[in-house]
């Protein structure tokens, strides 16, 4: 490494000053001396040898001689350099000889550059001090500001450890702060009136005299970066030299001025490595010939450009005057010295305080003010307000007239935020040495000196005297010298005891001296040294103490070892807790390390613990107070020309030594590699606002801390545990965190912090949306285990995101830190467990019957809950019991301490759950692949596709979540260790976490067609949402029902309206009345009807009579006007609604209740005040107007067959509903309470009944346009093919065509869920079919088409095959001569309701009275199975031709046999009244076996039918597996329900029984009941309570009603007419079939004698027709979404 040259000036006061300079060259290098042209060299003195230990001693060798001198050195130099402009001399022993072998020498020359014409120089300055001119060693302390330029000394020390500062570090062609080329600097003895300049290279300018020395500029004693390169441009002429007596304060301000050659150059910040040189540097153009002028100079003048960090101060007008007075450091007192005012950039030099020899120095620099100073940064825009310069300033260079003025303003703006400051915090007294320590140094070098006496005196001096920086260097050197001499002198003592005693005493003195140096009272002495010297002194102290300790260990004999109870140690711990109970720092050496370093069975170990050494052995840039260092480093580029340099961008990593220094050494050497690492436990000195601990050791060679060979095992708030594979001095380094930023986000840059907030926010929002979707739209989802699993997963993820967001904002000192870590641990374990259970559930679904029908699995879900949360809480509890501190010892509140407990309780469980989830996922894929190769039915294919999609999404979900958690973990670990890859993991976490939230929303919400539909409905139904979301081109989505005012009940909408149609039955006056027209609602589209939110309610407005129609508004009384047998009510008067949400379905499951703008007709009023309504057909107002321009009445429409036949058929839309008056109370009947219930309104929908008293709302099921109407009496007129006589062929062809279309439509369904739903409808419909009935005879003129009418069964849009003959009860109107009869549908129950299915035979009165329910029921079931066999086995419904007479006769025989079987079953029920319960159970078992066999036979026949359908390319009729499952479910329920009936059976009144249990010889359809989730928990309990209550009070029927009661009132209420008949029409039709007396007699008998035996009523006289009040039943089905769908049975013709 090349040395560099530096100049140190001594202050001279003279009118004619000659510069005195000093040059050095290390041994083996060439000393070059050069003066300016016209000047010659005048040597004063020279020496080849060594007078200082610091010059040319980069490695700090203290054993060289410092009294080495070659006497003829000056003569040799004079022969080479005297009176020459330049010369070069090689510093080598071949030139000068070897005055001191073994010592590295250097050549030192003191000279002057004088004019060649000058023969003598007269000066008035005082003589230099003797130590300058003498041959003795200079009192320049270690590295006393001597910088070695290239080519002169050893290599330069390494650059300071500073991070790269943007905009400051110099690059090629632009030297910056840390890339300073070697240059010569001058140190000025700073008196206010002194003015000298030292020019680099030893060239003297302006005739000034100076002394110069050499210095190395690469490092600073204060650890700060060296100053930037300063340029001082000169324009010299031999004869043109300004007067040296001209004061600088009188220099004019302004543009280019002539200034003396000795004008100072101001600097901005810090100087070179050691403080012996000022930043007053000048730079001349090399080898510039005489007479040439520099750029920008004025002829005849010497122009000097003054700069601070390349800022032209001449342009700023600061070359003199009052502005320059601001750039001075004020006078102050420090270290018993008075420091006078000093110019910025100068170094104030003065003699050391009293009692010490040498010089003291202190530099004045510019430092930026603190943020609270109130000064603002410079604004470049302010330059626009700079006044224009005067014209006189632009005479010589008009092109550069404006820039100097603008530049002056810029400089003023930049400099105003800075203030002159003494730097460093204390003066540099490295060269100050006390006289008594100099005396001790002389004594120790004497041969006959007493080492013990010297050591005692040294300990006394260091404890009682004031020391300076130079004294530290001398003291540590004496300690090493004493130890070396004692090592040689101990052999002169023959007595072992005397030898040990002397060395023990010497060690005590050395330890006392070291303790005195580290005492707090001597802290100022350490601060007198620059950082480099501090490190050297500390290293020397450590090595000296260690050397003396080993000296004692070598001296003590083995017999002197104290005896212990056990002499064999597995390990050694220092310090011993018994001896040092207050120490918390520990070093533990393993046994293997002791054995490897033993000698003769003994091991020499030296332990040392140092106090306050951590304040000396500081890392770089921490030698002065933290506030000043932060300000200094932040403003290193204070005056850079680059205006983009922002001080805030310069980020400095401040590190401190945050533990005591503890040392351990073995006898073989200092750096011994150990076979097993040692363990150190070090206590943190500072616990607040510190982070990132690092285990380090002190490197003796580099004089710095190093982390090689040491690693951090664990850490917490107070301690850190380290592991090192070698021995030396150890400590902990930690980063200082700003007090205002002490959370985890301190390691985030601004952008990453914002991105993390955004990422977590997005994920939380989408998780909340998913949870709300599960809650609000619960009717869409099946209440299954999968839904519960995903709900739990989302809850865990939400907790993790929120806890992570809270944890990164907390510190380890926060009270919530430990709790956050605990809950986060539990949430992560629970989340991974739920993922494992989700994969297991998919696997179990594929391996069980759950593939067919996904239902609620409460036991399994409860087991998942127990395993998930139970295991997680157990693991966390165990972790807390073992080591609670593991949750509080980490730096961040989102991580546990990385120890064995962390891996056992966190990593291992998470990995187990993830591996299990992946394993079950792969098993599920294998099973799906196997099933895909086998032949499955449509239902299994649909469910398999759904499960396949769920598994794919779950697997992607699992991988994405793993990526999120792994990236977060590695990011936090990397940021803690300051790893460069931490930012990569951080941005990966941001991306993955955002994708996780988006994936949750897309997977669970967007991809589900049902959810999308519910979202649309939900948006349409809420008026608070913006219209842009709720409105569309064709519909308006929100219907707002107002309850006040005269227009109450109308639908408020903004949709596109059609032309209002005149309601049926409204007179012409009403049509002409504008007020009446306003009350007529405006028809809107179906979307508006579907989107309406109001329930069907009573109009509570005050009663008033309409002017024209005479109707009563707000009541349910029968109106006064009728039209054609129709009793007309005004729309909007009695009821106000266009549709409503089903009370027990989900919020979005809205079904159309009745068509908008249609009249409601009150049929009759029941005994309890019920009013029965139906809505007549509204074909008339949908059809185009005829030529007459008026609307037709229903009778006129149907009488016009030709017009009906030619008009396009519309969808069938008819419905019934029932209302009860609001009694003001709607409480439910309490258990055990007798009497009449508070209100009959609590039967089905307690919530809706409370407000609107609507009990049941069956909505319509539309038939396809073009299908035959459902009106039997008009079927002939509306069906043209029937008139042609080709009905059989026509309907056969139409049936085949429709089945193909339906099959094609099913294949084009939009989703697997829709296919599953369609298929479930078919299966449930066929399984819920009752027994076959005797079909009524067709009209006489249609008798020849009897078989065709039987074939034409109604097909709703969900069917994919024909309904069987067992469904005849379902479409009696169709069989009687009308195809496509109306079917009414409504969702009655969902998750919260308990739905059960019943057969009408279960309520049979005979069986209840005779306690023989089971026999009758199963005989009926056998009849139903027989009907099913004929249904699936025969060809009447297979789609082929069935027009032969033999098939018709066979079908009649089967029907007769079934009728006889029903009669026999009833007789058997009567005959077995006295049988006991055991026999009944046997019969039940026998019937169950027969049922099972029948179902199996039916399945075989069904398979054959399926093959026949497959041959025609049509879908199969049903699913065998589903039918079998449902049959078993029905069988089990029937047994349990019949037992309940027998337990509570009692003689019941006719009116108290359900309507389905009355006399019904033909109707045996399926009915069902619904309870609202209360009572005894099921419909069976509710029905049992109903029976008991009705048995007690027969005249007050109440409680919960079966649905059948609403439509089949038997003897207790009026019947409900079909859609196309009024009661008058029905009575006329019945009177044609039977005499009026028979009907009256039957009706009178039924009402007057309720105590007759039910058997007598069940079998009336064969010539006696049934009463006109025929019962109507409902068919119920439960689809896979747990949705009950009801179908109203049309009344037989």
UniProtKB/Swiss-Prot annotation:
Compositional bias annotation for Basic residues: 1656-1672
Bias type Acidic residues, positions: 1472-1486, 1496-1507
Domain GAIN-B positions: 564-740
GO terms for cellular component: plasma membrane
GO molecular function: carbohydrate binding; G protein-coupled receptor activity; mechanoreceptor activity
Membrane topology label: Multi-pass membrane protein
Annotated InterPro entries: GAIN_B, GAIN_dom_N, GAIN_dom_sf, GPCR_2-like_7TM, GPCR_2_extracell_dom_sf, GPCR_2_secretin-like, GPS, Lectin_gal-bd_dom
Cytoplasmic face of the membrane: 775-787, 836-861, 928-954, 1007-1693
Ranges for region Disordered: 185-299, 375-399, 1156-1194, 1220-1247, 1294-1319, 1433-1521, 1601-1673
Region (GPS): 695-740
Key words of the record: Cell membrane, Disulfide bond, G-protein coupled receptor, Glycoprotein, Lectin, Membrane, Phosphoprotein, Receptor, Transducer, Transmembrane, Transmembrane helix
Record's compositionally biased regions (Low complexity): 275-299, 1294-1309, 1439-1464, 1630-1655
Residue stretches spanning the membrane: 754-774, 788-808, 815-835, 862-882, 907-927, 955-975, 986-1006
GO BP annotation list: adult locomotory behavior; cell surface receptor signaling pathway; proprioception
Residue intervals on the Extracellular side: 1-753, 809-814, 883-906, 976-985
Domain SUEL-type lectin: 25-114
Post-translational modifications: Proteolytically cleaved into 2 subunits, an extracellular subunit and a seven-transmembrane subunit.
Biased composition (Polar residues): 185-198, 256-265
Disulfide bonds: 695-722, 710-724
Main localization of the protein described in the UniProt heading: membrane
Modified residues (Phosphoserine): 1142, 1239, 1246, 1310-1311
Comp. bias regions, Basic and acidic residues: 1508-1521
Subunit (UniProt): Forms a heterodimer, consisting of a large extracellular region non-covalently linked to a seven-transmembrane moiety.
Protein name: Latrophilin Cirl
Organism (species): Drosophila sechellia
Lineage: Eukaryota, Metazoa, Ecdysozoa, Arthropoda, Hexapoda
Gene it is expressed from: Cirl
């Amino acid at each position: 490494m090349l040395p560099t040259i530096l100049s140190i000036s001594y202050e001279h006061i003279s009118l004619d000053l000659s510069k005195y300079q000093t040059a050095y060259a290390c041994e083996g290098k060439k000393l070059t001396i050069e003066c300016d042209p016209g000047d010659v060299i005048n040597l004063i003195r020279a020496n080849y040898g060594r007078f200082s230990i610091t010059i040319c001693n980069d490695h700090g060798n203290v054993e060289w001689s410092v009294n080495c001198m070659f006497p003829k050195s000056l003569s040799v130099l004079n022969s080479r350099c005297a009176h020459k402009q330049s010369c070069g001399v090689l510093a080598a022993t071949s030139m000068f000889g070897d005055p001191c072998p073994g010592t590295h020498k250097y050549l030192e020359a003191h000279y002057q550059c004088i004019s060649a014409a000058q023969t003598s120089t007269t000066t008035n300055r005082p003589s230099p001090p003797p130590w300058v001119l003498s041959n003795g060693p200079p009192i320049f302390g270690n590295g006393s500001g001597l910088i070695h330029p290239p080519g002169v000394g050893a290599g330069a020390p390494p650059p300071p450890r500073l991070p790269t500062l943007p905009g400051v570090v110099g690059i090629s062609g632009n030297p910056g702060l840390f890339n300073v080329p070697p240059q010569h600097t001058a140190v000025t003895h700073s008196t206010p009136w002194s003015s000298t300049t030292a020019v680099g290279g030893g060239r003297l300018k302006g005739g000034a005299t100076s002394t110069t020395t050499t210095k190395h500029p690469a490092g600073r004693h204060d650890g700060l970066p060296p100053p930037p390169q300063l340029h001082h441009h000169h324009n010299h002429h031999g004869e043109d030299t300004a007067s040296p007596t001209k004061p600088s304060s009188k220099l004019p301000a302004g543009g280019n001025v002539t200034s003396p050659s000795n004008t100072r150059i101001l600097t901005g910040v810090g100087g070179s490595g050691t403080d012996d040189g000022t930043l007053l540097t000048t730079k001349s153009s090399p080898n510039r010939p005489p007479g040439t002028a520099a750029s920008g100079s004025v002829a005849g003048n010497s122009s000097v450009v003054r700069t601070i960090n390349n800022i032209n101060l001449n342009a700023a007008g600061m070359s003199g005057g009052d502005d320059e007075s601001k750039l001075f450091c004020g006078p102050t007192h420090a270290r018993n010295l008075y420091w006078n005012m000093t110019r910025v950039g100068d170094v104030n030099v003065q003699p050391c305080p009293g009692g010490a020899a040498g010089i003291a120095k202190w530099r004045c620099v510019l430092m930026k003010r603190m943020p609270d100073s109130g000064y603002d940064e410079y604004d470049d825009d302010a330059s626009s307000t700079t006044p224009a310069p005067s014209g006189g300033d632009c005479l010589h260079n008009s092109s550069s007239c404006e820039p100097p003025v603008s530049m002056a303003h810029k400089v003023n703006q930049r400099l105003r935020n800075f203030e002159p400051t003494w730097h460093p915090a204390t003066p540099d007294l490295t060269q100050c040495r006390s006289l008594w320590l100099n005396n001790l140094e002389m004594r120790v070098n004497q041969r006959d000196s007493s080492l013990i006496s010297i050591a005692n005196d040294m300990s006394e001096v260091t404890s009682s005297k004031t020391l300076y920086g130079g004294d530290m260097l001398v003291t540590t050197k004496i300690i090493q010298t004493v130890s070396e001499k004692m090592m040689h002198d101990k052999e002169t003592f023959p007595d072992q005891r005397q030898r040990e005693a002397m060395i023990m005493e010497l060690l005590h003195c050395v330890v006392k001296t070291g303790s005195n140096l580290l005492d707090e009272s001597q802290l100022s002495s350490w601060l007198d040294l620059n950082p480099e010297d501090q490190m050297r002194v500390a290293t020397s102290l450590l090595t000296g103490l260690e050397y003396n300790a080993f000296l004692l260990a070598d001296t003590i004999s083995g017999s002197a070892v104290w005896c212990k109870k056990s002499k064999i140690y597995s390990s050694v711990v220092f310090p011993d807790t018994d001896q040092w109970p207050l120490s918390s720092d520990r070093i533990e050496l393993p046994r293997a390390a002791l054995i490897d370093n033993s000698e003769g069975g003994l091991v020499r170990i030296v332990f040392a613990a140092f106090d306050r050494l951590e304040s000396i052995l500081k890392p770089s840039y921490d030698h002065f107070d933290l506030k000043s260092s932060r300000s200094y480093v932040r403003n290193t580029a204070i005056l850079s020309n680059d205006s983009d340099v922002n001080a805030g961008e310069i980020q400095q990593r401040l590190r401190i030594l945050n533990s005591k220094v503890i040392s351990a050494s073995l006898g073989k050497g200092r750096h011994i590699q150990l076979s097993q690492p040692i363990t150190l436990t070090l206590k943190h000195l500072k616990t607040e606002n510190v982070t990132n601990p690092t285990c380090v050791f002190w490197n003796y060679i580099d004089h710095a801390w190093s982390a090689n060979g040491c690693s951090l095992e664990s850490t917490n708030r107070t301690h850190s545990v380290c592991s090192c594979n070698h021995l030396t001095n150890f400590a902990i380094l930690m980063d200082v965190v700003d007090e205002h930023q002490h959370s985890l986000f301190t390691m985030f840059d601004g952008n990453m912090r914002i991105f993390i907030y955004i990422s977590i926010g997005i994920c939380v929002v989408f998780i909340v949306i998913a949870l709300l979707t599960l809650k609000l739209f619960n009717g869409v989802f099946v209440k299954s285990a999968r839904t519960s699993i995903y709900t739990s997963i989302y809850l865990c993820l939400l907790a993790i995101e929120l806890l992570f967001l809270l944890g990164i904002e907390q510190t380890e000192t926060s009270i919530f830190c430990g709790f956050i870590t605990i809950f986060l641990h539990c949430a992560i374990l629970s989340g991974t467990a739920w993922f494992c259970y989700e994969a297991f559930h998919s696997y179990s679904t594929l391996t069980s019957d759950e593939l067919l029908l996904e239902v609620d699995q409460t036991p399994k879900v409860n087991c998942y809950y127990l395993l998930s949360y139970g295991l997680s809480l157990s693991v966390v509890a165990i972790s807390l019991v073992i080591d609670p501190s593991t949750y509080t010892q980490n730096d961040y509140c989102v991580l546990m301490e990385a120890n064995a407990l962390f891996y056992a309780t966190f990593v291992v469980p998470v990995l187990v759950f993830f591996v299990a989830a992946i394993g079950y996922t792969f098993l599920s894929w294998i099973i799906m692949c196997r099933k895909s190769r086998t032949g499955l039915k449509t239902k299994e294919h649909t469910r398999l596709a759904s499960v396949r999609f769920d598994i794919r999404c779950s697997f992607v979900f699992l991988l994405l979540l793993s990526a999120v958690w792994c990236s977060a973990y590695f990011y936090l670990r990397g940021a803690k260790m300051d790893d460069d890859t931490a930012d990569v993991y951080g941005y990966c976490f941001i991306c993955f976490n955002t994708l996780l939230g988006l994936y949750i929303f897309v997977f669970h919400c967007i991809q589900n067609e049902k959810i999308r539909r519910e979202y649309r409905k939900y948006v349409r139904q809420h008026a608070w949402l913006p219209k842009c979301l709720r409105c569309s081109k064709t519909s308006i989505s929100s219907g707002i029902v107002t309850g006040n005012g005269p227009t109450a009940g109308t639908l408020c909408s903004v949709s596109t309206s059609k032309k209002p149609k005149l309601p049926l039955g409204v007179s012409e006056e009403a049509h002409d009345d504008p007020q009446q027209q306003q009350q007529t609602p405006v028809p809107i589209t179906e979307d508006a009807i579907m989107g309406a939110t109001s329930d069907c309610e009573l109009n509570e407005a005050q009663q008033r009579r309409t002017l024209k129609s005479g109707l009563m508004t707000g009541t349910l009384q029968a109106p006064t006007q009728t039209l054609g047998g129709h009793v007309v009510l005004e729309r909007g008067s009695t009821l106000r609604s266009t549709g409503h949400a089903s009370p027990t379905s989900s919020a979005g499951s809205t079904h159309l209740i009745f068509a908008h703008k249609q009249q409601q007709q009150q049929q009759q009023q029941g005994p309890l005040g019920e009013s029965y309504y139906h809505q007549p057909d509204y074909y008339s107002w949908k059809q185009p107007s005829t030529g007459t321009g008026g609307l037709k009445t229903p009778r006129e429409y149907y009488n016009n067959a030709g017009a009906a036949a030619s008009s396009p058929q519309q969808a069938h839309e008819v419905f019934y509903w029932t209302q009860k008056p609001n009694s003001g109370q709607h409480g439910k009947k309490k258990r055990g309470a007798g009497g009449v219930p508070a209100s009959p309104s609590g039967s089905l929908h307690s919530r809706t009944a409370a407000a609107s008293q609507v009990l049941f709302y069956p909505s319509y099921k539309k038939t396809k346009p073009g299908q035959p109407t459902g009106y039997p009496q008009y079927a002939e007129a509306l069906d043209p093919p029937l008139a042609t006589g080709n009905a059989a062929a026509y309907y056969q062809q139409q049936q085949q065509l429709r089945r193909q279309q339906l099959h094609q439509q099913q294949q084009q369904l939009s989703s697997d869920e829709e296919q599953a739903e369609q298929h479930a409808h078919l299966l449930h419909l066929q399984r819920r079919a009752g027994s076959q009935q005797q079909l009524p005879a067709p009209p006489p003129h249609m008798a020849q088409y009897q078989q065709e009418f039987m074939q034409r069964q109604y097909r709703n849009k969900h069917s994919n095959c024909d309904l069987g003959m067992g469904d005849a009860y379902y479409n009696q109107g169709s069989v009687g001569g009308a195809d496509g009869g109306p079917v009414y549908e409504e969702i009655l129950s969902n998750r919260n309701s308990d739905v059960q299915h019943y057969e009408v035979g279960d309520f049979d009165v005979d069986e209840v009275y005779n306690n023989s329910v089971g026999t009758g029921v199963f005989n009926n079931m056998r009849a139903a199975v027989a009907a099913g066999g004929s249904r699936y086995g025969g060809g009447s419904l297979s789609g082929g031709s069935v027009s032969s007479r033999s098939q018709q006769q066979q079908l009649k025989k089967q029907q007769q046999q079934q009728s006889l079987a029903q009669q026999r079953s009833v007789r058997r029920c009567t005959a077995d009244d006295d049988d006991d319960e055991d026999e009944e159970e046997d019969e039940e078992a026998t019937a169950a076996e027969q049922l099972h066999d029948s179902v199996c036979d039916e399945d075989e026949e069904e398979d054959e039918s399926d093959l026949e359908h497959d041959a025609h390319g049509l879908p199969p009729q049903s699913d065998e597996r589903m039918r079998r499952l449902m049959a078993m479910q029905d069988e089990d329920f029937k047994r349990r329900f019949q037992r309940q009936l027998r337990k509570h059976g009692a003689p019941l009144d006719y009116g108290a029984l359900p309507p389905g249990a009355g006399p019904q010889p033909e109707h045996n359809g399926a009915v069902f009941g619904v309870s609202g989730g209360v009572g005894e928990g099921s419909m069976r309990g509710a029905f049992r309570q109903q029976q008991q209550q009705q048995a007690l009070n027969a005249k007050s029927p109440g409680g919960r009603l079966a649905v059948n009661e609403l439509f089949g009132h038997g003897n207790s209420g009026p019947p409900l007419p079909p859609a196309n008949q009024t009661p008058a029409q029905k009575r006329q039709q019945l009177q044609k079939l039977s005499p009026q007396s028979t009907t009256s007699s039957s009706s009178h008998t039924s009402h007057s004698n309720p105590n007759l035996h039910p058997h007598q009523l069940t079998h009336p006289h064969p010539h006696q027709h049934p009463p006109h009040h025929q019962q109507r039943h409902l068919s119920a089905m439960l689809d896979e979404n747990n949705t009950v769908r009801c179908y109203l049975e049309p009344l037989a013709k």
